[in-house]
Amino acid sequence: MSDPRYCAEIISVGTELLLGNILNSNAQFLAEELAQLGIPHYFQTVVGDNRDRLQSAVKIAAERSGLLIFTGGLGPTPDDLTTETLAACFETHLAERPEVITDIEAKFTRRGRVLTDNNRKQALLPVGAELLPNPSGTAPGMIRSPRSGLTLMTFPGVPAEMRRMWTETAVPWLHQNDWCRSILVSRLLRFWGISESALAEKVAPFFDLQNPTVAPYANNGEVKLRITAAAASEAEGVALIAPIEQELRAIAGRDCYGADNDSLASVVGALLHDRGQTLAVAESCTGGGLGQLITTIPGSSQWFWGGVIAYDNRVKQSLLNVSAETLAEAGAVSAVVAEQMAIGIQQRLGTTWGVSITGIAGPDGGTETKPVGLVYIGIAGPTGCFGVERRWGAERGRDWVRRLSAGEALDQLRRSLLNLT
């Protein structure tokens, strides 16, 4: 762990955060910013509008971090306690700042309002504090070092105001005061078709690296590995990451589909575009979800021709040429129907590839032999057609089944395109 004197801690003040009434987007923003600046931070605290509990949080944080960043509690109401609590914690008097009063009065005048006594509270800052101007609102922040090795920064809780103050004033101050001793450079590798535990087992030795570090994440069926290097420059960070990325890709093989802002749809689109090939889709249980993923990609009209949502068996028959006999014998949720759907859309639209999805998204409709979460994907291409069965389960709900099915369809197409290379 880094020297605590050079570590930051984010303290978010507001009962509305504790109650879950609003998301703590300020902490998310600041965490990302600190990472980009190369300032380590290991703790985040959320505390309600209570003087005693805020004092307790400050005392704990001041023992383990050298830069305490506060958001919220700078307003004019009695429950806005951040400034006065910090003054009490470090036995400092508050003094009214005339320049803040002037700024608030000017803003009130422009809005046709009159300065009230409670707004004067926002001009009270600890003696010796450096002002953090708030160009967008009436609550300024401050920077203060109450003792050696400890710096306090305060910001209003309004995200737009906080972000502007951070960017325009706080970040330059951090650079000028030698807080940004290195930068963090990251690379995000993306995987599909392998579980987080299986991938972690394959690459376990990499989790012990110190610089760069490797950390796994998983959501919505996708697994990610973030490689992060601390370096003096971006070029140095990229150089540290490159050999690790190469090794990880070699271990994962085709389970690694891309990096950073890549998506399965964008990767598939690039493969189709490079080959001059086209795609059409036929969807049942995903109800257009696959087409939506595809059409979010700019330029997808160059390789995606369209699709059919064949929710009813009559549509499967009339538009996709799925035979009534097959539907009667195998059922709509079957590999053979998925294959016929894929071939049907491929032939109807005249595309290189046809992809289909049919399944039981739930919560109803499952049976003992065909439970909720059972999905079949059909891939029809230049060399033939095949079907894939997936059992996602019912535990995570209908949307989960639909999302994973659309992602899996794209991944099966990606692998098919690569296999023809």
Swiss-Prot record:
SMART domains in alphabetical order: MoCF_biosynth (SM00852)
Matching InterPro entries: CinA, CinA-like_C, CinA_C, CinA_KH, Competence-induced_CinA, MoaB/Mog-like_dom_sf, MoaB/Mog_dom
Disulfide bonds: none
SUPFAM superfamilies: CinA-like (SSF142433), Molybdenum cofactor biosynthesis proteins (SSF53218)
CDD domains hit by this protein: cinA
NCBIfam families from the UniProt entry: cinA_nterm, PncC_domain, PRK00549.1
HAMAP family for the chain: CinA_B (MF_00226_B)
Family that this chain belongs to: Belongs to the CinA family.
This protein's name: CinA-like protein
Organism: Synechococcus sp. (strain ATCC 27144 / PCC 6301 / SAUG 1402/1) (Anacystis nidulans)
High-level lineage: Bacteria, Bacillati, Cyanobacteriota, Cyanophyceae, Synechococcales
Gene (UniProt): cinA
